[in-house]
């Protein structure tokens, strides 16, 4: 897998800064963090449901 070079990451961050502006970055970061958190919860919830189904079938 190809990872971006440091100068590419800096360029991406500058583009994000220009698009959203410095005042919006905390809001964007918060929204992104909440989205990732909800995604992880949804994944773990599906795994728990699958585990419950397997236990019910095995009983």
UniProtKB/Swiss-Prot annotation:
Record's keyword terms, sorted: Cell inner membrane, Cell membrane, Membrane, Protein transport, Translocation, Transmembrane, Transmembrane helix, Transport
Membrane topology (UniProt): Single-pass membrane protein
GO cellular component: TAT protein transport complex
Annotated GO biological process: protein transport by the Tat complex
Chain segments annotated as transmembrane: 3-23
InterPro entries: TatA/B/E, TatA/E
Keyword Ribosomal protein: no
Protein's UniProt keywords contain Cell membrane: yes
GO molecular function list: protein transmembrane transporter activity
Cell compartment(s), UniProt: Cell inner membrane
Protein family: Belongs to the TatA/E family.
Subunit structure: Forms a complex with TatC.
Biological function: Part of the twin-arginine translocation (Tat) system that transports large folded proteins containing a characteristic twin-arginine motif in their signal peptide across membranes. TatA could form the protein-conducting channel of the Tat system.
Protein name: Sec-independent protein translocase protein TatA 1
Annotated source species: Aquifex aeolicus (strain VF5)
